[in-house]
Design a protein with these regions (language model features):
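Hydrophobic face of amphipathic alpha-helices that form TPR/SEL1-like repeat modules
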Residues: 1-5, 19, 32-41, 68-77, ...
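Short coil/turn and helix-start
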Residues: 5-11, 25, 43-47, 61, ...
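Short, low-complexity interaction segments enriched in Ser/Thr/Pro/Gly
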Residues: 12, 27, 91, 101-103, ...
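Residue-level recognition of tetratricopeptide repeat
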Residues: 28, 64-66, 100, 136-138, ...
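Ankyrin-repeat and related helical/solenoid repeat scaffolds used for protein-protein interactions
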Residues: 148, 158, 165, 170-198
């Protein structure tokens, strides 16, 4: 962990992978998840998507919530396995109900876009809102968009602005872009031209 994030030592992915690997044979969920993540992204080791997927599966079977969400992403993008939106939805749903913030957002996105299910804007908004409560910037931005265009919730420009501002002030670049565009499209707000240029 310390080598992964460079806490009190120089950041060293190879050393971090080596140390995490010590717990893999013991079946430690955190070790399985961390080495899977390194293998997926090629951190300190040659990228191996298939092996990453297998380790995520093992960690998920042991109840590791982030691994359950990661399996959803593997199925969503076809990384280390075939692309399968319905399987992705299954894992996102499982992880979301266990409190995983990213899975809550992903579940909202799937309902929003109709991936592996029928489009359901109300459910999409619900899950965006749940992820936003956890402080996830992308979910806060998605909520703002729902309010701006009336997707799954009654249209409310003031609330859209409030949520765009919240996410933008957290440093989320997509929210900053959306906020600039929002001001450009809504000239009724004070100093909208100036604010549009700023964001």
């Amino acid at each position: 962990y310390f080598y992964e994030y460079g806490i009190d030592v120089d950041q060293d992915y190879e050393k971090a992978f080596e140390l995490y690997s010590l717990g893999v044979d013991e079946g430690f969920p955190r070790s399985l998840f961390s080495t899977a993540y390194f293998l997926q992204n090629g951190y300190g080791v040659i990228q191996d998507l298939e092996e990453a997927f297998l380790r995520y599966e093992e960690a998920a079977a042991l109840g590791h919530n982030d691994a359950i969400c990661a399996l959803g992403e593997c199925y969503e993008y076809g990384q280390g396995t075939r692309q399968d939106y319905q399987r992705a939805l299954h894992y996102y749903e499982k992880a979301a109900y266990e409190g995983n913030s990213l899975a809550k957002y992903k579940l909202g996105r799937f309902y929003d876009l109709g991936y592996g299910c029928n489009e359901n804007y109300q459910k999409a908004f619900h899950w965006y809102q749940e992820a936003a409560k956890d402080g996830l910037e992308v979910a806060i931005t998605a909520m703002a968009t729902c309010y701006e265009f009336g997707r799954g919730i009654e249209k409310d420009s003031q609330k859209a602005l409030e949520y765009y501002l919240k996410a933008a002030n957290m440093g989320y670049m997509n929210a900053q872009f959306c906020l600039g565009y929002f001001y450009e499209m809504h000239s009724e707000y004070p100093e909208s031209e100036k604010n549009s240029f700023y964001w």
